Amino acid sequence: MKYRDLRDFLSLLEQRGELKRISQPIDPYLEMTEIADRTLRAGGPALLFENPKGYNMPVLCNLFGTAKRVAMGMGQEDVSALRDVGKLLAFLKEPDPPKGFRDLFDKLPKFKQVLNMPTKCLSSAPCQEQVWEGEDVDLSRIPVMHCWPEDAAPLVSWGLTVTRGPHKERQNLGIYRQQVLGKNKLIMRWLSHRGGALDYQEWCEAHPGERFPVAVALGADPATILAAVTPVPDTLSEYAFAGLLRGHKTEVVKCLSNSLEVPASAEIVLEGYIEQGEMAPEGPYGDHTGYYNEIDSFPVFTVTHITQRKDAIYHSTYTGRPPDEPAVMGVALNEVFVPILQKQFPEIVDFYLPPEGCSYRLAVVTIKKQYAGHAKRVMMGVWSFLRQFMYTKFVIVCDDDINARDWNDVIWAITTRMDPSRDTVLIENTPIDYLDFASPVSGLGSKMGLDATNKWPAETPREWGRPIKMDEEVRARVDAIWDELAIFSDKETKR
């Protein structure tokens, strides 16, 4: 599925009945959240609020409100096809050496695909059709949503933040929420291990006292947004990967006030800087946990320029108790993660992040167990292999006869194959999401691994139970007479 920018993607959604235009005046203060939340929970379409109260700019919500639309944003027609995206990433992350000339020939298309996707830098771009700078900069022109009653202020939620470290050629793209602080100021809430925060830290060390350039793209195309939250190999830029997803090179343009490159088709771009040492208290905000988070200090982003397309669209979302857009995206991106994990740990059969677990806080893994202690090795691997799982608090490991996506199966395995003392792994003082108020210290907490696999002789001296299973000949005989028994009126009742 190919598209060029957000508007092109919205046209495709509308053709397929996946976009609903709302012409009634709707308030960005709370009302949009309530409508978007009800729509998402019902599996409904993306929403384009054409007449936000008090504004002349339409607001787009629920763009990634179903796993299918996430897949479409990644250039695929179906969620199952995201496994192929994961396989490509796994290959690029750690290419296998060719086993011979024929194998090398077979691998060439993958390398050619990547080499053909560098960015294309334009001299002018749609995102700079209109420009405000200096005293004309006013964030109140943008219909930024105020999502929950006790939120501190309106919150920019889909800001694609572009930074570059002082010793890096490659830019970093990250999605960080930003509290509106004034007409030209926002609070940049990035966690210390995120790419933007690391770039800023390195800048402060290399250039003490100098302003750190930042750009934020609002309304970038879906492929670029999704590339920013996907485990792209360090050797591949998010822009190049976005080009692979959408089927053509990512077009960028240099900012007017600095050398950062932003998506040329973005609806709105905020340019500016962070003054070293300028911090402000951020929050509280209703978050993806379903709770308001505590207040903490983060850097202040000063906006010097606002550039935008004519008739710009503001792309927004809300976060709350699952399901919300992050949870839905987690379900879809789960399919991308599986091949990447299997590349490193071939014994993994399936990997599942239940949306009820706030996108990433709990993982269920099924494996082909090969030796005593195998489950514990897999736990450690999940926590350490991808940055996306460093905040996963609970990892449940089961055998491959268990369906990782069926809680009936998983709970049965936990309650019948686990001893709480022997099969529970607790690790203290590990990195934890700052938003996790249950941890004893902000940003630092514990992790739990549950080994719900069948135990091997080295793991228990007791004889292990054998699963109950009906004789296959008896099942076949009953199958043959089942309909005649007419026990249920519904003939489609499962046998």
Swiss-Prot record:
Gene3D superfamilies: Single helix bin, UbiD C-terminal domain-like. It is a peripheral membrane protein. Binds 1 prenylated FMN per subunit. The active site is at D287. SUPFAM superfamilies: FMN-binding split barrel, UbiD C-terminal domain-like. It is found in: Cell membrane. Its EC number is 4.1.1.98. InterPro entries: UbiD, UbiD-like_C, UbiD-like_N, UbiD_bacteria, UbiD_Rift_dom. Its cofactor is prenylated FMN; Mn(2+). It is an enzyme of class 4 (lyase). Mn(2+) binds at N172, E238. GO terms for molecular function: 3-octaprenyl-4-hydroxybenzoate carboxy-lyase activity; metal ion binding. It catalyses: a 4-hydroxy-3-(all-trans-polyprenyl)benzoate + H(+) = a 2-(all-trans-polyprenyl)phenol + CO2. Pathway: Cofactor biosynthesis; ubiquinone biosynthesis. GO terms for biological process: ubiquinone biosynthetic process. One of its GO terms (cellular component) is cytosol. The keyword Acetylation does not apply. The keyword Lipoprotein does not apply. Belongs to the UbiD family. Homohexamer. Catalyzes the decarboxylation of 3-octaprenyl-4-hydroxy benzoate to 2-octaprenylphenol, an intermediate step in ubiquinone biosynthesis. This is 3-octaprenyl-4-hydroxybenzoate carboxy-lyase. It comes from Yersinia enterocolitica serotype O:8 / biotype 1B (strain NCTC 13174 / 8081). The gene is ubiD.
